[in-house]
Amino acid sequence: MLRRSPTLLRVSPFSLYMKDLAKNGTLQNDRNPAKTASRLYRKLSEPEKMALQKRAARVSYPALDAYNRFQKEYAHRFLHLSNKKRQREVSKLWAELKKNGTVKVPKAPKAAKSASSKVKTAAKTAKKTTAARK
């Protein structure tokens, strides 16, 4: 069974490679650009593929992220519908609100602080309290 993971939902290295080929003009006037791109992609060396994977991991689509947050926020309103119909209703709502200019997208959650920064702040407050006691 396929599982859903953030890695699978991101941009694929192959799609980035196809974009690069399209920018270079390699795929211009080609009857089957996907076939040509896949043949060239398979010929890439391992370091080149790893570089593409690293680039793909960094790429995100802000508009898609905003829609996903909106969908997460509003999907619970349509729990009485099947999943497919729920997705349609949320997308209709998104389109309608976007057309009116009244889309309220929830903000992205802030990145959690690292454990080391928490330890440092705790140590600083401990120093301050001990210094204040003296």
From Swiss-Prot:
Enumerate composition-biased segments (Basic residues).
Answer: 125-134
Question: Has keyword Mitochondrion?
Answer: yes
Q: Which GO terms describe its cellular component?
A: kinetoplast
Location comes to: Mitochondrion matrix, Kinetoplast
Q: Propeptide residues?
A: 1-10
Q: Where is the composition biased (Low complexity)?
A: 106-124
The segment annotated Disordered runs over 106-134
Relate the induction remark in this record. Expression varies periodically during the cell cycle in the same manner as transcripts of several kinetoplast and nuclear DNA replication genes.
* Keyword annotations of the record: DNA-binding, Kinetoplast, Mitochondrion
Give a short account of what the protein does: Histone H1-like DNA-binding protein involved in the organization and segregation of kinetoplast DNA (kDNA). The mitochondrial DNA of kinetoplastid protozoa consists of about 5,000 minicircles and 20 to 30 maxicircles. These circular DNAs are held together by catenation into a highly organized compact disk structure referred to as a kinetoplast DNA (kDNA) network. Binds preferentially to a specific fragment of minicircle DNA and is able to compact kDNA networks through DNA charge neutralization and condensation.
Record's family?
Belongs to the KAP family.
Name of the protein described by the UniProt record: kinetoplast-associated protein 3
